[in-house]
Regions:
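Phosphate/oxyanion-binding loops and surfaces in catalytic or ligand/nucleic-acid-binding neighborhoods
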Residues: 1, 19, 325
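Bacterial N-terminal signal peptides that target proteins for export
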Residues: 2-13
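N-terminal signal peptide c-region/cleavage motif recognized by signal peptidases
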Residues: 22-24
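Extracytoplasmic/secretory-pathway proteins
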Residues: 26-181, 186-198, 203-778
Length: 778
């Protein structure tokens, strides 16, 4: 929101001093994290993407996720099943290894109650067999090592053990090497070696870590322990390119350590690391890791990886990142009120000349989009299976970003019916985009088909919270398209859907409040639109689409909409419609809802600008119906006195008055939360009541009528003084620089001259005269 207070030092006088206090937001303005407003529609996935989740494009340092890969744990459980017998349930193995408290397991063993405590657990049953005693002893040692040397704190665990628990720490003379060598079984030998290796790592015995890894995990082996051991080994090596190379091997071979790998990876050593790679596959992985943290255009890396490994999983993921970047750079400024991408670069100055920067960046981004699109089209036929469907979906999405709807539709239809569920979901999003751009949005069949597309994504959101952002983005675009087609009601409800989805999993805890139901319509709706909205609210036989857009968005009380309708009518100077609407509502509505009782509590016929703070009374029972009725009555009287009262009233319903909430639902001296959610409302507010809200046009008109009609010197003095006030605040309604003020300084006018000459003997003059006021005519 543009500032509404002149930055220059303005002369003021104590009796007329306006104290602008922020009533709904901080003066410095409302801000949210860039990631919150970022748009993203593309979320197609290939099998294996799960471990890459933290590296999706994001304005945050890493992409937030509610899910963690359990693939490595599953592999470990399968290894135990293969070793101890196929009759073991891997879920039972998981319970013991990853879900059972160490204290609970050790206590049960010491009390000889393992079989009772873990009844029907096939893994425990197998461990208790006499032939498997060595494996049970290993589990006991592994559980013991889950504790650190610090009493009461578990090692690598969020939980806390009981204060009276004996942690059974390793004795100082415990010999890992002896334990490893005495194990005749290779399976156990490797597992003891891994326990020792990890123990040495935290004890900072780096040489022992490297030695154990080279001794027990260097040979070809499919055990999941190998990449785990290699991870600790890499972190104990001082040669940074070699450390990078080993970390890249870990990254490629397991899921659990992918996030940790990128946290420890040493950047800007690309060439040195690549020199250690043994084949194209390894080189492609190193290049992929380097690209996963790059927020800038990176088609160069994608092309290089494609040449090395055309069907690479990482190649697909990086293509998706590029699509998400372009969505951010193009869609986020287009569909959000913030107006800039979530990620900006220091070379781009969005603040000096926003329009120029936006146009230049849009043109640059479109050129890059087409370069990426043409590359993907050129390689599409050389790919196959899941990779081909993924690239096809990416091409389609790029077409939609570029507003090439027909081309987007063409590639969407080329996605195989056998594509995985994630790509099918992406296809539904893209079919929804086609419908929004090309179909008759008023057609019931079209709307219900849109509901089907929307719902297909909704059904997946509980298992992947990342889809909340896709729904937020889809509904925001859908809202814009319905608005462009003239359907403000649907646009508003979809906009609210978008805001709810943007709250993500926390939306269940946030109950909509009064203004959230009407905020969009306050900015965009006409009286007719509100009538249509109320009709939809009352409709009993809603279509599936209507039920969907109304769910969680429609106001529970029709009087919310009536209040807005009456307010819009008042802004439009339709007092009769405003009265009709307000009078149909419960007359205690403004005492029980929103913030009316807090901000509509002063006499609207006493100009706030003429009152000292201590003179103001906040016990006025404001009733909108009665207020409008009074205005209608005063207009009919059309006397000097009635026009003076009308002028006072219109002054007070302006931005400067004590009854501004009669005209607007929020007041701020800077950007507010409502501006962030619904857009800057300044231009709309400038039009309220023919410019009265900021420029006091109607107030001045009635003061001039009162001055002209009155025969009473005191009334004329009051009218003259207030005309001066209207002129003064009208002059400073817009942001004025010192240079502009010098070229066009404020001039008091004849009304103030008359106030100090013709009316200087009136009670009004004696009450409000002061040196600062007189300085305007000296």
């Amino acid at each position: 929101m543009e500032p509404k207070i002149s930055p220059i030092i303005m002369r003021a006088f104590s009796s007329l001093l306006l104290v602008l206090s922020v009533q709904f937001s901080f003066a410095c303005g409302w801000q949210v994290s860039p990631e919150t407003s970022r748009l993203a529609l593309f979320k197609a996935q290939r099998e294996g993407f799960f471990k890459l989740t933290p590296f999706y494009y994001s304005a945050d340092y890493y992409y937030a996720t509610n899910t963690v890969s359990g693939v490595d744990q599953e592999k470990n459980c399968l290894e135990w099943k293969k070793k101890l017998g196929n009759n073991i349930n891997t879920e039972d193995v998981h319970v013991i290894l990853y879900e059972t408290d160490s204290e609970q397991f050790q206590t049960a063993f010491e009390n000889k109650t393992l079989k009772t405590v873990f009844s029907k657990n096939t893994f425990v049953d197998a461990l208790l067999l006499s032939k498997n005693k060595a494996f049970l002893n290993y589990i006991l040692l592994a559980k013991m090592l889950e504790y650190n040397n610090v009493q009461d704190t578990k090692w690598e665990s969020w939980g806390q053990i009981r204060s009276n628990y004996n942690s059974n720490q390793l004795n100082d003379n415990f010999d890992f090497e002896k334990k490893i060598k005495s194990s005749k079984d290779t399976f156990l030998k490797q597992r003891y070696a891994f326990l020792a290796l990890r123990y040495y790592f935290y004890a900072q015995q780096k040489q022992d870590v490297v030695r154990l890894c080279n001794t027990y995990f260097a040979s070809e082996s499919n055990t999941i322990l190998k990449p785990w051991a290699l991870y600790y080994n890499a972190l104990c090596i001082d040669n940074l390119p070699l450390q990078n190379y080993l970390l890249s091997k870990v990254f490629n071979s397991c899921e659990e350590k992918s996030f940790a790998v990128l946290q420890h990876y040493n950047w800007k050593l690309t060439n040195e690391t690549l020199a250690l790679a043994q084949n194209d596959e390894e080189r492609s992985v190193i290049l992929a890791i380097e690209s996963l943290r790059n927020p800038a255009p990176d088609l160069k890396s994608i092309k290089e990886i494609y040449e090395l490994s055309p069907n690479s999983l990482f190649l697909s993921f990086l293509i998706g990142r590029e699509v998400n970047k372009l969505e951010d750079w193009i869609f986020t400024p287009q569909y959000t009120n913030d107006g800039t991408p979530s990620v900006t670069f220091s070379s781009t100055d969005w603040y000096e000349n926003y329009a120029k920067a936006k146009e230049e960046n849009f043109n640059k981004d479109i050129l890059y989009l087409r370069e990426l699109e043409y590359f993907l089209i050129s390689i599409r036929e050389q790919t196959s299976g899941e990779q081909k469907d993924y690239i096809t979906a990416a091409i389609a999405q790029l077409c939609f970003i570029d507003d090439q709807v027909d081309e987007g539709k063409k590639y969407t239809n080329l996605i195989s019916d056998k594509a995985n569920a994630s790509i099918q979901m992406q296809k539904n999003i893209q079919l929804a985009l086609v419908s929004l751009k090309q179909d008759d949005l008023k057609d019931e069949k079209v709307q219900n088909q849109l509901y089907t597309y929307f719902n297909s994504v909704e059904n997946l959101v509980e298992t992947d919270h990342g889809l909340f952002k896709n729904l937020y983005s889809l509904y925001r675009i859908a809202s814009s398209d319905f608005y462009k087609k003239g359907d403000v009601v649907t646009a508003g409800l979809l906009s609210m859907k978008s805001d709810i989805k943007n709250e993500g999993e926390y939306s269940a805890y946030n109950n909509p409040y009064f203004f959230s139901y009407i905020g969009y319509f306050d900015r965009n709706a006409s009286v007719k639109d509100i009538d249509l909205l109320m009709a939809l609210q009352q409709k009993t036989n809603k279509t599936p689409f209507e039920k969907y857009i109304c769910s969680g968005t429609i106001a529970p009380n029709s009087n919310y909409y009536k209040d807005l309708k009456g307010t819009i009518a008042f802004r439009n100077n339709n007092l009769e419609l405003a009265y009709e609407t307000f009078s149909s509502m419960p007359q205690d509505f403004w005492e029980k809802n929103y913030e009316y009782k807090t901000y509509l509590n002063e006499n609207p016929f006493t100009p706030k600008i003429l009152q000292k703070q201590e003179e103001r009374k906040f016990d006025y029972r404001f009733n909108k119906t009665d207020f409008i009725a009074k205005l209608i009555q005063l207009k009919k009287q059309n006397t000097a006195s009635s026009n003076l009262q009308l002028a006072h009233a219109y002054f007070n319903v302006s931005y400067l008055g004590n009854s501004w909430m009669m005209t607007s639902y929020d007041w701020s001296s800077g950007a507010s939360y409502t501006d962030y959610v619904y857009g800057d409302n300044t231009e709309n507010e400038k039009k309220y009541q023919n410019g009265n809200y900021y420029n006091l046009k109607m107030a001045k008109m009635y003061y001039e009528k009162a001055l002209k009609m009155s025969k009473n010197s005191n009334e004329k003095a009051m009218a003259s003084l207030m005309i001066f006030e209207c002129n003064y605040y009208n002059h400073y309604a817009e942001l004025i620089t010192e240079e502009e003020e010098a070229k066009n300084p404020f001039k008091a006018g004849k009304e103030l001259v008359n106030f100090y000459s013709i009316y200087k003997s009136t009670p009004t003059f004696k009450k409000y005269n002061c040196p600062l006021l007189s300085s305007f005519i000296n």
